């Protein structure tokens, strides 16, 4: 549990597009009194901290610093965005060997100065790297969280909301499994303000069939690739997703978010990190929820877990 104190310190490891934008989103949210940026490119980190600090007049009081791992000491949350960026045509899982080696140098340094922090992994492939962080840190699973499928779930809500012309916040659903190509949409539990999606579509004379589900799912699954093809990287939406997770932790909200967590016995899945609805609060992940999936969804989730396990088993440097 994060201890109540007058200051809240968040460190962001990696000051690339995702890290810098995350720091910006955290600054706007007003959740932290201190934000520390750490990156191997110290000049860029200094520049990002300066640029952010120059906006201090427009937000709640917050101290933005650039520094090294020693400066992260006693952070409440350490957000890890460092790693090789995903290139055009490259899958998240193809990043693994590059980023495992990077994490082997980062995590021991983070742990050295932050014995009680919650670690929030954002770097891709996030599920695999969350597991790597869990193993390297020696922290309990509750305090090693991956950003998981929080963003993917938002993308799914956006797609449904756009097609049905409703506020996406009124769509209740989850993307589960890998944050990547094997992720699954949980159509069987999807509802619009507690009305099952098929019933809602029928009442409102809206499309809901195999073609609808396929199109929506493909758009969600391929969303990052489409953004990368157009602008080179994704960073705004993931920064907002990270900020949402951070707020849930710092506010001890006990809110349900599909973060990446260590799964130990769910449809036979165990010893792998993947996106699942979890109660997120001051202790980190307080409980993973075992929601009932239909047979098709459960089978796909098992395959998603197998994909992640195979990637870990085939990765070099572990």
Curated annotation (Swiss-Prot):
The protein's name: L-lactate dehydrogenase
A GO biological process held by the record: lactate metabolic process
Family to which this protein belongs: Belongs to the LDH/MDH superfamily. LDH family.
Localization annotation: Cytoplasm
Pathway: Fermentation; pyruvate fermentation to lactate; (S)-lactate from pyruvate: step 1/1
Active site feature: 179
Entry's transmembrane regions: none
Keyword Manganese carried by entry: no
Function: Catalyzes the conversion of lactate to pyruvate.
Cellular component, GO, one term: cytoplasm
One of the Pfam families matching this protein, by short name: Ldh_1_C
Organism of origin: Clostridium botulinum (strain Loch Maree / Type A3)
Residues annotated as binding substrate: 86, 92, 124-127, 152-155, 234
Gene Ontology MF annotations: L-lactate dehydrogenase activity
């Amino acid at each position: 549990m994060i201890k109540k104190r007058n200051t809240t310190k968040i460190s962001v490891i990696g000051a690339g597009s995702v890290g810098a934008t995350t720091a910006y989103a955290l600054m706007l949210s007003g959740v932290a009194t201190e934000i520390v940026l750490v990156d191997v490119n110290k000049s860029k980190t200094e520049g990002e901290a300066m640029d952010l600090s120059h906006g201090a007049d427009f937000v709640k009081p917050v101290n933005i610093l650039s520094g090294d791992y020693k400066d992260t000491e006693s952070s409440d949350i350490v957000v890890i965005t460092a790693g090789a960026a995903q290139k055009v045509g490259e899958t998240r899982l193809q990043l693994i060997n590059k980023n495992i080696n990077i994490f082997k140098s980062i995590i021991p340094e983070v742990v050295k100065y932050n014995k009680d922090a919650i670690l929030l992994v954002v770097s891709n492939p996030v599920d695999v790297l969350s597991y790597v962080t869990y193993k390297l840190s020696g922290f309990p699973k509750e305090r090693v969280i991956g950003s998981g499928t929080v963003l993917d779930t938002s993308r799914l809500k956006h797609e449904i909301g756009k097609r049905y012309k409703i506020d996406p916040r009124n769509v209740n659903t989850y993307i589960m499994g890998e944050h990547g190509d094997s992720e699954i949409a949980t159509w069987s539990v999807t509802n619009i303000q507690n009305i099952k999606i098929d019933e809602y579509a029928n009442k409102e004379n809206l499309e809901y069939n195999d073609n609808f589900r396929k199109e929506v799912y493909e758009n969600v699954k391929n969303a990052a690739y489409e953004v990368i093809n157009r602008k080179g990287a994704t960073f705004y939406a993931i920064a907002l997703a990270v900020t949402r997770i951070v707020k849930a932790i710092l506010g001890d909200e006990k809110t349900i978010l599909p973060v990446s967590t260590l799964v130990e016995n769910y449809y036979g899945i165990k010893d792998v990190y993947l996106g699942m609805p979890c109660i997120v609060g001051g202790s980190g992940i307080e409980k993973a929820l075992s929601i009932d999936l239909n047979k098709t969804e459960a089978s796909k989730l098992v395959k998603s877990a197998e994909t992640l396990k195979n990637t870990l088993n085939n990765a070099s440097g572990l």
